[in-house]
Amino acid sequence: MPIKPENKARYPADWKQIRAAILERAGNCCEQCKVANGARIARGTGESADTFMDAGGYVFDADTGTQLGRVRHSDYECSGKWTNVVLTIAHLDHTPENCAPENLKALCQRCHLRYDAQHHAETARATRKARKAVADLFE
């Protein structure tokens, strides 16, 4: 995920080098689904949900990266939208200051969002609760 301007100060000065080292460790692929950084893929829908297809028609399990076979593009159920994969570095403990290699993982957009889903839900819930509490002060 891109670093929000308000969080930049939480990252070390050598973040670019740390990021490069994690991408190198991962072979420039998502450490979850194994999709390559910069690959152009289509995400499956319906019967093809939880899969992705590369430009060559190879279909992969979106959770493990296991190759499932090859299909014609016209036979693959998807939205028709192609996505350019951009690897980001996930902090497994959600703490940007903790840049230990074992706390960092190279993930594609889908895998990073899935990894962060529970944390994002908890943060949103806490934000709503805090806003409600502030609103109560002015009633």
What are these model-predicted stretches?
Residues 34-41, 104-126:
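Short Cys/His-centered divalent metal-binding micro-motifs
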